């Protein structure tokens, strides 16, 4: 498996996010202005794009935001999500980052907690789906 980095939203990342967040989960406002300045990452199995995420600077010095982590259905349950978190943490450390924050769907918070992410703040909604902020010090 190979991770490719883009400073723009590539078609492969767009396709994965469309499948996962729009087609499967029903989000209507999946793509936003953050896509214009975030670094985008796509994980490939051979030439097949199978997962994506984005990273951008947070509000505080040394803080980075991880978002739009998506794995296509056929590859779920194979620890790819956990591998992505590890890769994202390495990327942030290479940028001299000190922490990662993310806005997790509440149904996925245990997945992030297993990797050391801790909840903070209030539960909010994005398009009617509960989300919680989570953070990990690196």
Where are these regions (language model features)?
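A short beta-loop-alpha structural element at the N-terminal edge
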Residues: 1-13
């Amino acid at each position: 498996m190979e991770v490719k980095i883009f400073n723009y939203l590539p078609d492969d990342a767009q396709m994965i996010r469309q499948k996962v967040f729009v087609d499967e989960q029903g989000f209507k406002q999946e793509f936003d202005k953050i896509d214009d300045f975030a670094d985008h990452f796509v994980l490939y199995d051979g030439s097949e794009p199978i997962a994506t995420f984005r990273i951008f600077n947070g509000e505080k010095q040394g803080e980075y935001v991880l978002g739009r982590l998506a794995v296509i259905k056929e590859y779920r349950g194979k620890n790819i999500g956990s591998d992505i978190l590890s890769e994202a943490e390495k990327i942030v450390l290479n940028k001299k980052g000190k922490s990662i924050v993310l806005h997790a769907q509440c149904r996925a918070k245990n997945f992030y907690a297993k990797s050391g992410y801790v909840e903070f703040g209030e539960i909010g909604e994005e398009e009617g789906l509960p989300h919680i902020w989570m953070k990990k010090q690196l």
